[in-house]
């Protein structure tokens, strides 16, 4: 099968590489390309107008991301083509003597004088629909002014968060990228980063539900790419922002974040430096009820009041050097430092339901838990781009990456029991009289976790336009090697040892995991006419995983090879409508922390573990979407995912009331969804409305698992709705008032049922200093409705219920000030797809 794939891929690449560019026989088509006169890069969003000798408009178009445009006309005799883009001097080309077909490349010159004196009042649309993705420009989004990156993501079409706070797209897990490169963070680390990152630092969010073969196949739901702001034109530019929040639920506390972005572009260099820092205290009240025993006759109620804090710093420095007219050398360095900690005194009551009439409590447990974590990440990228032929956008890009992550965590738990009922006291007396251990003797533990991860990656990409710039071929190869080292130690504590003293070493576990991934891909797109275009791709990935559980003398790992096809088909019957159909086959590789077999305690009776034998999950994805009037999108989709492992499997011991969450290939999940996205619909000149609405039908069927103590032969279907809406009123004197909110109905997440929740927010903002400064006041979660409830059912018995009251309601004040010109074009750099699974 591997030989067959390589043969097919080589045939595709060879045929495409030797396909000679030629003029299209359709005499109604004019094609060309627009570039920056200084960098030579293709310019996007250039307005191209074809005018006759009387200056009447004959045809118009806009350049794509590579600077290419297509015009249609019956004749070019006596016509001129005019080019315009904000920040550049206008240009025009006479078509006298030019035959219908390809127009020579046009270079636009930056208009430095205009940028220094003019006030630019235009804005990009909130949503832009590209060939294979939706782009959300967040500059006008109310939540971006004072909110964090999580608030901004909630406004993106199809984006939701699961019960553990992980990002999902259309109900499926996604790979999260930052500036065209994977985030290099585990689930909790990414959550902390997004909550602490200022929304004003974000330029756009790309929602790629069906990535092409150029991207890694990782991510069942696709890719969400968060792009931050950068500078473009000559000179010094940048921005500063600060945001403070005051929250009073469940207790009064404050949070804050700030960012600084600086950029300088000279004749041959482009330098960017950014810093983001945040401190995010939080309070959480969690009540958990678990039924256990014969016929679930006993109840364990746990009340957990915790306080904690996330804090961190991110620094990024990038440098591009134009070493010749066709060669660019670049480097990127990033540092991410973050830490967290919490302290949680816990009280548990154990009730005997057989004595429920008098509600006599059996016993109680007073528990104290605390945890501190720290993560340091360092990454570096060196990239090189060579342009062979600007008129064909023919270029070669090489990326070499290295990432190092170090994470340390320490956990403390102390549990003290008290016999409250005569029955409990009698049990204790009987045990002591028989010379047995006191069943109500306290216990506890200290544990420490050490993790190191190193990733090396090399990627080569080649691309060029074909067929008079109406087609494009992309091909490339990639190799990635990663090694993670995990060490875990547990120390047992028993009274009368002082609570702050660490006990004796009771367990030691060492787990090492390595992975090699080798990939080849080819991708071809073609515009067959002004109405029809298509894209097909094929990617092959060969994976060599190795796991070594040293303390158990246990090894795991099985090589596997997969082929991932994808197909896109677009039909544009008119300028007001687009119909798209796409199919993709993708996988979810196990995250490194999902493979870790160490036991991590949530509380004395609940813990989670990984599985070193966890296998990848695979998904088929089919999507049909339509776009009307550029701002209304209707989408229907279906996915079938086997070896589903996105949520942990609950292994519930009904006799003891203990609950183990284990990562496992749980079963098969099928999902069908309908989505509507309405972007900035004008009700009046001063009132706009934005709406994202999603309906999902989910069916989960568990694989038979003889190791489960409950929930065998489990299957469940559910329907759910989620949505986001905002309305903005544009007031005089550059004031704006906005109301926005999001909500979701109950939804099935594997074995669990997540209750519905919603939130309503309001903001009032003022722009000044010619629009360079903005001050925004915002009220979050006005009705205190953003609480998460979770339940677990065995048949018609609710065996577990959790109510999480987390601090969300509050008021925030944010300020931003920008200086400089505009936004920088991004180059094809970075190859850390696999490091998003750290």
Per-segment meaning from a language model:
Residues 303, 455-459, 502-509, 633-692, ...:
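Outer membrane beta-barrel strand-and-loop segments of large Gram-negative receptors
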Residues 35-39, 47-51, 82-88, 100-142, ...:
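Short, acidic, small-residue-rich periplasmic hinge/interaction motif at the N-terminus
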Residues 227-242, 284-290, 301, 311-318, ...:
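Surface-exposed extracellular loop regions of Gram-negative outer-membrane beta-barrel proteins
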Residues 102-107, 149-151, 190-193, 207, ...:
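N-terminal periplasmic accessory domains that precede
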Residues 316-338, 364-548, 572, 576, ...:
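Face-selective signature of the C-terminal outer-membrane beta-barrel domain
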Residues 509-513, 587-636, 640, 659-673, ...:
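Outer-membrane beta-barrel signature, preferentially recognizing the C-terminal barrel domain
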Residues 202, 217-224, 232-286, 310-313:
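Outer-membrane beta-barrel translocator/receptor signature
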Residues 155, 182-209:
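Short acidic/polar hinge/loop motifs at secondary-structure boundaries
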